[in-house]
Design a protein with these regions (language model features):
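Acidic, polar-rich low-complexity tracts and alpha-helical solenoid repeat scaffolds
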Residues: 1-179
Length: 179
């Protein structure tokens, strides 16, 4: 159901599986995973957060890693940068998936940028571009975000140069008038 974007049906099916006493642990983790993702897609972030928290202890390290990343991302999206960074530090101290670790560093770069630390954001993104050897989409995402920061800095620099030029011209005009 989830892959068909039928999130309500996914929630119902996942809850039925989780209610079974004899459900296999792998099946239960998969049900919890899709339950959490569906709750989030449906805008029920409170319940989704609770499900993702449970998943951080999953034996399936991909589910656990994605759950931790998603918790950090939710905090970031809610402008809870300190909370997001706490989760990021937990992830980086005990990484279990290179993919989700790289995604975590990209999110961390977003936090640096949000806090005005563009140099650290750029260095973090460049490190991913230079060193990550996994999924190309991660490298592309890091490159796009780095380009975005560089383009914005370039625009800001051009505006600053334009203002300085206007000020210089105004001063020159005053000097010429006073001669």
């Amino acid at each position: 159901y989830y892959l068909l974007n039928k999130f309500d049906s996914t929630i119902i099916a996942s809850n039925k599986i989780l209610a079974l006493e004899k459900a296999d642990e792998n099946v239960s983790e998969k049900a919890s995973y899709y339950l959490a993702k569906s709750l989030l897609k449906n805008g029920n972030s409170g319940q989704a957060i609770e499900e993702f928290k449970k998943l951080t202890n999953a034996k399936n390290t991909e589910y656990a890693s994605e759950a931790q990343y998603t918790l950090a991302e939710i905090q970031y999206n809610n402008i809870q940068l300190d909370e997001a960074e706490k989760i990021i530090l937990e992830i980086t101290s005990n990484p279990s998936s290179e993919f989700w670790l790289a995604k975590t560093f990209i999110l961390w770069a977003d936090i640096f940028k949000e806090r005005g630390n563009k140099i650290q954001a750029k260095q973090t993104l460049q490190s991913i571009i230079d060193n990550y050897e996994g999924d190309q989409s991660i490298i592309d995402e890091a490159q796009n975000k780095l380009n975005e920061i560089n383009n914005k800095q370039s625009q800001e620099q051009k505006l600053q140069e334009q203002k300085l030029q206007e000020q210089k011209e105004a001063v020159d005009e005053i000097i010429i008038e006073n001669k």
